[in-house]
Amino acid sequence: MTPSAISPVAAGWIRRWLILMALMVYAIILVGGATRLTDSGLSITEWRPVSGALPPMSEAAWLVEFEKYRATTQYQLTNAGMALSEFQFIYWWEWGHRQIGRLIGLVAVAGFAFFAWRRWLGQGLGWKLVGLIALGGLQGAIGWWMVSSGIGETERVSVAPYRLMTHFTLALLILAVIAWLWLDLGRQQRAGAPRAAQRAAMALMGLIFVQMAAGALVAGLDAGRTYTDWPLMAGEVFPAHYIHAELGVRSFFEGREATQFNHRLLAYGLWAGSLAAAWAFRKTDVHREFAFLAVLVSAQAVWGILTLVNAAPMGLALVHQGLGVVTTLWAVYTVWRAGGPKTVAEINPPA
């Protein structure tokens, strides 16, 4: 086997492994969303990647963890008087989120080691997978960086919204890389669509990533539970407190009015852009991809409005987040499909 060639059998198993990791990343994104919505993210005050895999196993151990949480600003300002059973509820959400992260790391490293041992990895793919695993390690570190913003000497009762945005956006990037590698190892051919279609697909994908990041800011500030009228905001087209004097430019990241207004504005632009692209490229080889992307964006926009006017209850908010991830993945597929024919044959044709 040449360094750049991968057998069909190897490609099939690697794709199954990538699908498993994609499902696990999707699951951790949803569990992370639930952790945020239940304000559980600060319940574990230490970063113990290995020893933290075991939860408290006795009442005494639970009381030790509870005492650590009682030292946080979140407990003192918002959860004072919380019962142990209530603490256990939020603890399990955060522990579960971290545990899925550990499992993803194990599956990633074990799978890579097995494929390398079998010599199933071409040189190019091997380095790409090393990069993917490195991104996963970075994501774990960023997760703690995010949590640490609400622990210790701080006035925060939740994690810093821009750190939450970074953590969430990197999870999307990891999922996008997994999807791209999975597509590259498949037998479906790229369409080689007109340059205009390729540029439009790239623009829509980029805008979707920006919109998802903006949504993370809204979530981090609970901004979706403050201005719950639509299409206006507190009866105004443009919110009066878009810029807070005490925040200045930080209003774009820390102001509820600015983050929600920007999220709405991006949604309108993305909605119009996806419909325009579906119409403009209706006679190309990627018309189905653009059409379905427009359907997903439309569904996400409508569901977002429904979530907003109901003050973002957990069920609606999680569906909104999950559908957003699916929309992002379809945008990645649209970019991949619209691109030129494969230039590096990584799959050997059957004998």
From Swiss-Prot:
What does the record give as cofactor? heme b
The UniProt entry's GO biological process terms, in alphabetical order, are: heme A biosynthetic process
Q: Name one GO cellular component term.
A: plasma membrane
Sites where the protein binds heme: H263, H320
Kindly list the places in or outside the cell where this protein is found, as annotated in its UniProt entry: Cell membrane
Q: Which reaction does it catalyse?
A: Fe(II)-heme o + 2 A + H2O = Fe(II)-heme a + 2 AH2
The molecular function terms of the Gene Ontology recorded here are: metal ion binding; oxidoreductase activity, acting on NAD(P)H, heme protein as acceptor
Tell me, in one coarse class, where this protein mainly resides.
Answer: membrane
Give the matching InterPro entries.
Answer: COX15/CtaA_fam, HemeA_Synthase_type2
Where is the chain membrane-spanning?
A: 17-37, 103-123, 129-149, 164-184, 201-221, 261-281, 289-309, 316-336
The pathway this protein participates in, as annotated, is: Porphyrin-containing compound metabolism; heme A biosynthesis; heme A from heme O: step 1/1
Enzyme Commission no:
1.17.99.9
| Keywords recorded for this protein, A-Z | Cell membrane, Heme biosynthesis, Iron, Membrane, Metal-binding, Oxidoreductase, Transmembrane, Transmembrane helix
Q: Which domain of life is it from?
A: Bacteria
Pfam families given for it? COX15-CtaA
Task: Report how it sits in the membrane.
Answer: Multi-pass membrane protein
Record's function text: Catalyzes the conversion of heme O to heme A by two successive hydroxylations of the methyl group at C8. The first hydroxylation forms heme I, the second hydroxylation results in an unstable dihydroxymethyl group, which spontaneously dehydrates, resulting in the formyl group of heme A.
Q: What protein family does this chain belong to? A: Belongs to the COX15/CtaA family. Type 2 subfamily.
What does the record note on quaternary structure?
Interacts with CtaB.
Q: What is this protein called?
A: Heme A synthase
Please report the organism this UniProt entry assigns to the protein.
Answer: Hyphomonas neptunium (strain ATCC 15444)
